[in-house]
Amino acid sequence: MIHELKILPEYFDAVCLREKTFELRKNDRGFKVGDYLYLKEWDGEKYTGREVTRYVNYILYDWTGGLQDGWCIMNLKTSHLKATLDQTRGEQDE
């Protein structure tokens, strides 16, 4: 499954630079290992046009040390899904 999510600029940059390889989110979408996060930079008022896709390869659903119920931490890996999606869209337009 592909989840389209907003992300603030300071976090977006860190994800793009591979400095931030995790995402803490309310698990209101039923995130699962094997999903993709389609992260779209949001400046608080509008989308900036920058976007990146990451693959979810591990999820921590509960942690007695402080993760609240209904939240999860996802480990992110680089993904080439967006390039594949763009290529597929281009082929459909022909």
Which residue stretches match the model-derived regions?
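Catalytic phosphate/metal-binding cores of nucleic-acid and nucleotide-processing enzymes, i.e., regions
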Residues: 1-87, 94
